UniProtKB/Swiss-Prot annotation:
InterPro entries: NusB-like_sf, NusB_fam, NusB_RsmB_TIM44. GO terms for molecular function: RNA binding. The keyword Transcription applies. The gene is nusB. It comes from Rickettsia rickettsii (strain Sheila Smith). This is Transcription antitermination protein NusB. Belongs to the NusB family.
Amino acid sequence: MSSNKINKKSIARIAAVQAIYQNILQNNDDMDDIMQNVLSFYQNNNSITDLPENLKISLSISHFKMLVKLVFENIHKLDEIIDNHLTNDKDPAHMPILLRALLRVSICELLFCPTTPAKVVINEYTDIANDMLNEHEIGFVNSVLDKIAKEHTRLI
């Protein structure tokens, strides 16, 4: 039986979204505590249920830590960018927590990780959104990331 693996950076992105979600949900600003909680979950594959036997999950710890740290360092700028992309009838205070977490991490990677092509960032986080959010929110994530990529003149 062959072993399947998911890209380590893809898992790191999912884990970073989960860490930022935990930060918002628990109002916990202890970045090290949050990172340790999420890392311990991923490092113990036995705690991940519903996986095929031959699927191996591991994440790029360095990419995960970099994303979480960058979000914490730039959280106010990221929220300002997110809020500026809402339509007039949308109240930032009513944005679903998971959507805000995903946008914080994805916009952060788009703006502060220039070695990752914008097209890769947009595709990765749209795929993550597809697994976590509803259809309207998926389209919103794709649209916001595309606009931000164009605004910041990165090639997509």
